[in-house]
């Protein structure tokens, strides 16, 4: 029951699945935006603000190309004691990431933005706090061998909806925030804007 054209500015299959299961009709269009080219921005933004900036940048990038559509941009930032982490690019980096997170609590800041005609309509970030249990080197190696390269798509090198749940001893936060798309607040906003009809 959609009243408008929606575009998801993300190539994430997990985000697309969430929207599809929620009954939304949308197109997928990846943003042409290099997240690693943000060194200067990181120095002046908190991790939560950075997630909003990146979600907005992605939504604006796609909105500029498809001005009449309502564009959803998303991003997630992992914050460990104020240090910002990006997605890993190899199994070796994945191993190091899990060693770093082992026995510590980190935060995931997931932002969602809505843009139309290149203009921001809404952006907001939500946080989840993830306590990783102490992990042995043997466990990390076995885990990475089992899950394969799919975890390289996750900034935390885990997929909470699968085997990644075994990495944690405590989680404080919304499931959708952990996945990287704060779905419930997004649906509320889409209803408020009249995009989803009751």
From Swiss-Prot:
One Pfam family linked to the record: Maf
Residues carrying the site annotation Important for substrate specificity: 14, 76, 161
Signal peptide: none
GO molecular function, one term: nucleoside triphosphate diphosphatase activity
Record has Disulfide bond as a keyword: no
Role of this protein: Nucleoside triphosphate pyrophosphatase that hydrolyzes 7-methyl-GTP (m(7)GTP). May have a dual role in cell division arrest and in preventing the incorporation of modified nucleotides into cellular nucleic acids.
Active site per database record: 75
Enzymatic reactions: N(7)-methyl-GTP + H2O = N(7)-methyl-GMP + diphosphate + H(+)
GO biological process: nucleotide metabolic process
Cofactor(s) the protein requires to work: a divalent metal cation
Main location: cytoplasm
EC number: 3.6.1.-
Entries under InterPro entries matching the protein: ITPase-like_fam, Maf-like
Transmembrane segments: none
Family that this chain belongs to: Belongs to the Maf family. YceF subfamily.
Subcellular location: Cytoplasm
CDD domains assigned: Maf
Record GO cellular component, one term: cytoplasm
Superkingdom of the source species: Bacteria
Official protein name in the record: 7-methyl-GTP pyrophosphatase
Coiled-coil ranges (or none): none
Keyword annotations from UniProtKB, A to Z: Cytoplasm, Hydrolase, Nucleotide metabolism
């Amino acid at each position: 029951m959609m009243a408008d054209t929606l575009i998801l500015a993300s190539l994430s299959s997990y985000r697309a699945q969430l929207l599809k299961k929620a009954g939304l009709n949308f197109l997928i269009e990846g943003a042409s935006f290099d997240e690693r080219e943000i060194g200067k921005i990181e120095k002046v933004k908190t991790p939560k603000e950075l997630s909003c900036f990146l979600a907005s940048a992605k939504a604006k990038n796609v909105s500029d190309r498809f001005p009449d559509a309502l564009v959803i941009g998303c991003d997630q930032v992992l914050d460990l004691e104020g240090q910002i982490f990006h997605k890993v690019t190899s199994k070796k980096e994945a191993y190091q990431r899990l060693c770093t997170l082992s026995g510590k609590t980190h935060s995931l800041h997931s932002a969602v933005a809505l843009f139309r005609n290149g203009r921001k309509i809404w952006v907001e970030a939500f946080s989840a706090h993830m306590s990783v249990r102490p992990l042995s080197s043997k466990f990390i190696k076995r885990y990475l061998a089992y899950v394969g390269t799919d975890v390289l798509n996750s900034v935390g090198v885990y997929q909470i909806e699968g085997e990644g749940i075994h990495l944690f001893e405590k989680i404080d936060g919304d499931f959708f925030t952990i996945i990287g798309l704060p779905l419930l607040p997004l649906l509320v906003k889409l209803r408020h804007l009249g995009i989803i009809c009751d």
